[in-house]
Amino acid sequence: MIDTKTAIEKITNGEFDNLFTDIYIDSSMIDYQKKRYVHAIEQYETIFCPDKVAIFSAPGRSEVCGNHTDHQHGMVLATSINLDTIAVSAKNNNDVVRFVSDGYDMITLNINDLEVNDDEAGTTVSLIRGVLRGLKDHGYKIGGFNAYATSDVLVGAGLSSSAAFEVVVGTIISGLYNDMKINSVEIAQISQYAENVFFKKPCGLMDQMACSVGGMVNIDFKDCLLYTSPSPRD
């Protein structure tokens, strides 16, 4: 956790440039990303208040080969991309999630109400509710939090904006309440559950797996036994 003022200073002074290069690969994107992160932190301060926060990222994805074979028990080669969803987040002192996505109104939900609501099908709140329910059912600690998110993953462009969103919500809970101990495969599976059951979209698991594991991944869905292996960068 880092207080918002210090985070802005460190980003502006270039102390995280190596980290940005590792995440986004393209060094020409670093200045843009620094401004983007500073803006996100400033928006968090405006909407909520200056605070000690954590900043999370989940990338979009592109399939290399095997699109739609994930739900036909085939093999998939997919990769994360350097367009991502980032979220500035902190615990709050109640059982309420307050989530603001750039350009949208605040979503508020109580973590004690995690039942499927058919009226929420196809909405962002259903994804948050579904991820929280999945994490709780898997025995993980959940709690209230405030978050501001912004995304460069284009909606409707085949880059899995919804999967990136689900994964960033799961990663927020992993970071704030579970010491970042929820593994990426489980976050992906819970994200798929949220999209299938709460959002009401019968998607496969490729999108969430590529977004959560990161890098290039080879996924084998044969006999419904999930095996995933990161592929080398070079």
What are these regions (language model features)?
Residues 66, 81, 91, 101-103, ...:
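Glycine-rich, histidine-containing beta strand-loop boundary motifs that form or position
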Residues 2-75, 110-226:
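Gly/Ser-rich oxyanion-binding loop with an adjacent helix/lid
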Residues 227-234:
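Conserved small/polar residues in nucleotide/adenosyl-binding loops
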Residues 101, 106, 160-162, 231:
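Short linear Ser/Thr-Pro motifs
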Residues 90-94, 98-117, 122:
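Acidic, low-complexity central loop/insert segments
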Residues 75-93, 213:
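Structural signature of FAD isoalloxazine-binding scaffolds in flavoprotein oxidoreductases
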